[in-house]
From Swiss-Prot:
The protein's name: Proline-rich protein 9
Lineage: Eukaryota, Metazoa, Chordata, Craniata, Vertebrata
Cited InterPro entries: PRR9
Superkingdom field: Eukaryota
């Protein structure tokens, strides 16, 4: 929980290599790179962050750091699904989050009585 809270408070700051190209994609980064946990279940957050941040910023800084440039822009889901998505397990939020982290959603959002 504390991990998610800290992420929410921290703005999306590009890595050093991306700061060189900040002027060219600052607007996009600010628009799209909002903390994923702020709107974890909305369309914008998980998928759009990958779409815009990776191609736009990574293309500009690919020579400097192809991998690092996409790391800060990826959502938290691969490691830890946002609690706001998994706790309610509503159809809507589940559908949105499944796109980003299907395994975690299945683990936490499985209907009771199945599996165990």
């Amino acid at each position: 929980m504390s991990f998610n809270e800290q992420q929410c408070k921290q703005p999306c700051v590009p890595p050093p290599c991306l700061q060189k190209t900040q002027e060219q994609c600052q607007a996009k980064a600010e628009e799209v790179c909002l903390p994923p946990c702020q709107d974890p279940c909305q369309e914008k957050c998980p998928t759009k962050v990958q779409e815009v941040c990776v191609p736009q910023c990574q293309a500009l800084s690919q020579d400097n750091c192809p991998q690092q440039s996409q790391d800060p822009c990826l959502p938290l889901c691969p490691d830890q699904c946002p609690s706001q998505c998994t706790e309610p397990c509503q159809e809507l939020s589940q559908t949105k989050c499944v796109e980003v982290c299907p395994q975690k959603i299945q683990e936490k959002c499985l209907p009771p009585g199945k599996g165990k």
